[in-house]
Amino acid sequence: MTESRIDFRRAKFLISAPDIAHLDQYLPGDVGVEIAFAGRSNAGKSSALNALTEQKSLARTSKTPGRTQLINVFELDAQRRLVDLPGYGFAQVPLALKNKWQQALGEYLQKRACLSGVVVLMDIRHPLKDLDMQMIEWAVASEIPVLALLTKSDKLAQSAKMKTVNEVRLALSEFGDWVQVEPFSSLKGTGKPKVLAILNEWCHPQWLTDELDAANNAE
């Protein structure tokens, strides 16, 4: 079966849930393919989702870091979803709420069988904070590929941008092929084709391709 290209512009809001337990209640089971977006509260996660889907308000942006407290799910088609995870690491969030978010993130990454890939978004000027590394380590430990997306790349000159990209690639080289590193700018569109190509690949895991082939052959 030839790998089809997913039209990410067709993404539409599906549900919000406070944690993975509620996610299981609303979704048709742990099935299909999900790609998760995770990042610190000021990493530009909502802006990146809007830029990648070419929708200005798919994910709601806010000047107040820490606003996204829910797991928000967007549907691409009957088999595939994008999942916007709660922003983490915002200092002014109460400790109890922060711990609740961390628990929800950890449960999702470690227990969600349909998770095909995780995009960990980091401000290119402040990459690889402790919580970023924890997210990456959780995902790789569960054998889930990671795209470390260095956002707001338009904030740096080209030489400084590539210096940071290379430093992050070196720092994450211990994870081998499980982690890819790319610069990205929601404002300028820098890196968008590369990111969409990676997401498209994640949308076509071998098991889903085999399943769809079997269904087509049975018709």
UniProtKB/Swiss-Prot annotation:
InterPro entries: G_ENGB_dom, GTP-bd, GTP-bd_ribosome_bio_YsxC, P-loop_NTPase. GO terms for molecular function: GTP binding; metal ion binding. GO terms for cellular component: cytosol. Mg(2+) binds at residues 46, 68. It comes from the Bacteria. Keywords: Cell cycle, Cell division, GTP-binding, Magnesium, Metal-binding, Nucleotide-binding, Septation. One of its GO terms (biological process) is division septum assembly. Pfam families: MMR_HSR1. NCBIfam families: GTPase_YsxC. Belongs to the TRAFAC class TrmE-Era-EngA-EngB-Septin-like GTPase superfamily. EngB GTPase family. This is Probable GTP-binding protein EngB. It comes from Shewanella baltica (strain OS155 / ATCC BAA-1091). The lineage of its organism: Bacteria, Pseudomonadati, Pseudomonadota, Gammaproteobacteria, Alteromonadales.
